[in-house]
Structures are given as C-alpha cells and as structure tokens.
Design a protein with these regions (language model features):
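Intrinsically disordered, glycine/charged-rich C-terminal tails and inter-domain linkers
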Residues: 1, 128, 135-246
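Catalytic NTP-binding/metal-coordinating core of nucleotidyl cyclase/transferase enzymes
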Residues: 1-75, 79-80
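A near-ubiquitous, low-amplitude feature marking generic local secondary-structure context
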Residues: 2-6, 13, 17, 24, ...
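Acidic-enriched, low-complexity/disordered segments with a strong bias for Aspartate over Glutamate
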Residues: 3, 15, 28-31, 54, ...
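Short, acidic Gly/Pro/Ser/Thr-rich loop/turn segments
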Residues: 19, 105, 175-177
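Alpha-helix boundary/capping and short turn/kink residues
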Residues: 27-31, 130, 214
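Catalytic beta-strand-to-alpha-helix segment of the class III nucleotidyl cyclase homology domain
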Residues: 39-42, 61-172
Length: 246
C-alpha cells in the first residue's frame, strides 16, 4: 500500500466508456489502446502528485492532497487522450469524477462515503465528462487551468447517496466534448433542469460560433495585412490598377 494522503483528500475515479465496443472493433489491438490509456493516465496524474490507489481494466482510482492538482491532472489527461492518435481512428472516451472529503484510513485503504461519492460522480458522467462535487468546486475556486471553465449542473441524485449532490462539469478546450448528457437525474421536484440543459447547450453553440467567427476574422485581418504589405512594396502597380478601375 502506497503512502496515502491524509486529512483533506481529493479522490478521482475514471474509466473508459464503451470499452466493450472498442474491444469488438479492435480485436487484438485493444490491448495496445488500453496500455496507452494507462500510460497517459499515470503520467498526468503522478506528475501532479496523484497517488494511484487502485486500477482494474481501464478504470483508475487516484488520491490527491490538493483539489487543484487533481483538477489539473484530470484536464491534462483529457487533453492527452484527445491528442493521441489511436489505432483504426477510434476515439477513447474517458469519464472522471472528483470529490473532496476527510476520509478515514484503515488497514486496507480509505473508508467512508467520500470514496463512494467520487465513484458515483464518475459513473454519473458520459465519455468526456469531468464532474466535480460541490466541495471540490469550492476548494478549486478560480484556480483553474487555462482554457477551462466550470458549468453548474444543479442538484443530481447519485446512486447510494441519500441526499442530492450539487454537481459541476469542467468544460475543457482541447478535450473531447461529451456526446451524451450526465446520467444522474435531478431531484424529482426540480422542474427547471430541462431548461438549464437547453441553456447550457445554447451557450456551447454560441461559444462554438464565436470561436469560428473569431478565427475567420483573424484570417481576414491576416489577408488584409498581406495585401497592404504587398501594396506598400508595389505602389506603382496599385496606382495603375486604381486608375484603370476609374
């Protein structure tokens, strides 16, 4: 058993969504994908102080002494999976759940509901999701990696957790965007969750359009600058063209 962080600890659970489908598609090359997935996860998480508690198949359980380090590791791992060239053009979709608490430590490792809560946050997500509990969100504050924002999902029901949990999603530039909504349902009396989801989708579309427009404007400015530079070098030709157009 490794030396475990104690006191206030942030847990991260992760797994690969659709691993059975990947196995069917890739056959013998599936082992290559899982080996690379494990390498990417271990490199990013241990680099930021994560302690590997357990792993099984494509799933991991890490512990961190600081919530900010856990978030940074999760972000970098998601971006690394997006950048990786996978066999046969497949996409490896990783979901993660982060929760911070003050767990008890027994002879076999961590004990208590804090571990369960982090695990349930992971399984509440779909591939590409990084979900935070309210405690982790509060500890991270504004100390987010560049290109990362936090979107509140409101209260959600997590399996085996009696009270609803306020859940937050990391929106990460340069990572694979989730293709499915969060699986955990809101409380039965929350009538606004569909409206919240629609507003969130609208915000994503608006952000995508804004990035596209900004990129187009940058290209236009670049083209105009190039034309201006060319005109400065050949003023006579430009003047002749203007005269012809008259």
């Amino acid at each position: 058993m490794p030396d475990l962080p104690s006191g206030t600890v942030t847990f991260v659970f992760s797994d690969v969504e659709g691993s059975t489908a990947l196995l069917k598609r890739l056959g013998d090359r599936y082992d290559e994908v899982i080996s690379e997935h494990r390498r990417l996860m271990r490199e990013r998480f241990t680099e930021h102080g994560g302690v590997e508690i357990d792993t099984q198949g494509d799933a991991f359980f890490f512990a961190f002494a600081r919530a900010r380090d856990a978030v940074t590791a999760a972000v970098e791992a998601q971006r690394a999976h997006a950048e990786q060239k996978w066999p046969d053009g497949v996409t490896v979709l990783v979901r993660m759940g982060l929760h911070t608490g003050e767990p008890a430590v027994g002879s076999e490792g961590y004990l208590g509901l804090d571990v369960v809560r982090a695990a349930r946050l992971c399984t509440a997500g779909s591939g590409g999701h990084v979900l935070l509990s309210e405690t982790t969100r509060a500890l991270v504050g504004s100390s987010l990696p560049e290109g990362v924002s936090v979107f509140p999902l409101g209260e959600r029901r997590l399996k085996d957790i009696d009270e609803p949990e306020r859940v937050f999603e990391l929106e990460i530039e340069g990572a694979i965007q989730p293709q499915a909504p969060v699986r955990a349902a809101p409380p039965a009396d929350d009538a606004d969750w569909e409206t919240d989801l629609g507003a969130r989708m609208a915000q994503r579309i608006e952000a995508s359009v804004r990035r596209s427009v900004e990129a187009s404007l940058e290209r236009v400015v670049s083209d105009v600058d190039a034309l201006a530079e060319r005109a400065a070098k050949r003023p006579g030709q430009v003047a002749e063209r203007l005269e012809d157009e008259r």
